[in-house]
């Protein structure tokens, strides 16, 4: 469990660093008064979407690595492909949690950390969108 927690925290830190860098880039791409408001918001939103998709890649890689270390497996799939890991990470990070693929053993710890990470990053994104739209209205 300590190994899984350490991996989960490492993935959280990598994801947070990536997402904050992408938010800074989105702010540079969408400063007030430089381009039409809708274009700025669209460009910034695309970068934020890319950030969330890359965070899913980070966690998918972490899930695959942790599974290869024997920290658990995924039920409902005889063998996980790269797409399965990405799909599971994306569903987990967005906190949708469909349940068609689910982790066993210590991978559940990493899954919980992935969900918390996604919730935190979605909150950061909501703040970015709110501030961007608020600047456009003023």
Positions of predicted regions on the chain:
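Outer-pore turret/helix-boundary of cation channels
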Residues: 54-86
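Alpha-helical transmembrane segments of polytopic integral membrane proteins
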Residues: 19-23, 55-59, 63, 122-126
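Interfacial helix-start motif at the membrane-water boundary
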Residues: 42-56
